[in-house]
Amino acid sequence: MEQEVNRGLPSTFLTFHSSSFVELLKEYDPTLLPAKRAAETFGEAPHGTTIVAATFAGGVLLAGDRRTTMGNLIAGRDVDKLTITDDYSAVGFAGTVGISIDMTRLFVVELEHYEKIEGVPLSLEGKSNRLAAIVKGNLPMANAGMVSIPLFIGYDLEASDPARAGRIVSFDAIGARYEEKSGYQSIGSGSPFAKSSLKKLHDPGSDDAATLSALIEALYDAADDDSATGGPDMVRRIFPTAIRITAEGAYRYTEEELAAVADAVVARRSADEPGVRSFTAS
């Protein structure tokens, strides 16, 4: 009976003992890994930027623009670069789009595989470590210019203070991970401008609505100075995407919600004198 059930399955699936799906692929068929697949189609490819994240009282938010570029051309205007990876985490990628999509899908399966094998979900630190390993596995393609950098957010269920349980983890191209203590971070070509904006706008004690507005405004500022970043497109009604993580789980904002926030940001900025930001003391 056992032979009949196992008929057709490669021996690797029956003898491999690991909770890591990435390690299983390395053993079974390394060509299925993102770096190997990308090598087959190496050449000029679309790149995506910019991703921003910020904590608030009780959670953390992730937002991303919708533009992808290929050289000096706009390759896409409505690309979603954010993914909910499980109930309490999400990831956004900047860099080569094809590799980013493969790495994100692999990370989602990695988390699901671990939970099925071990019977419990990975800790937040464990999730970021697994993502770091996936990024490190793409090092050969990164050296060839096909870089993909993630920005990871999550809610720490083991945090002593639920109001400060939101976490942001960034990575470099070789897989090193850094937990952001400042409460905000940005990656991609527009990140210097987005971070400068968040440095003034971010308030870790604010609610999710105020933080979402700050993130959309940061993307607006990035798009103002970085041609590879797409801000709110008021003509085509294309707006940034955003994900919220709290103790209740992950939530993806609807197009209607994001449109309302973007409209308010653009209206507020349009009311200012051109080229000058006005700040009012509270």
UniProtKB/Swiss-Prot annotation:
It comes from the Bacteria. SUPFAM superfamilies: N-terminal nucleophile aminohydrolases (Ntn hydrolases). GO terms for cellular component: cytoplasm; proteasome core complex, beta-subunit complex. It is found in: Cytoplasm. The formation of the proteasomal ATPase ARC-20S proteasome complex, likely via the docking of the C-termini of ARC into the intersubunit pockets in the alpha-rings, may trigger opening of the gate for substrate entry. Interconversion between the open-gate and close-gate conformations leads to a dynamic regulation of the 20S proteasome proteolysis activity. GO terms for molecular function: threonine-type endopeptidase activity. GO terms for biological process: modification-dependent protein catabolic process; proteasomal protein catabolic process. The active site is at T49 (nucleophile). Coiled coil: none annotated. The keyword Cytoplasm applies. It catalyses: Cleavage of peptide bonds with very broad specificity. Component of the proteasome core, a large protease complex with broad specificity involved in protein degradation. Belongs to the peptidase T1B family. This is Proteasome subunit beta 1. It comes from Salinispora tropica (strain ATCC BAA-916 / DSM 44818 / JCM 13857 / NBRC 105044 / CNB-440). The gene is prcB1.
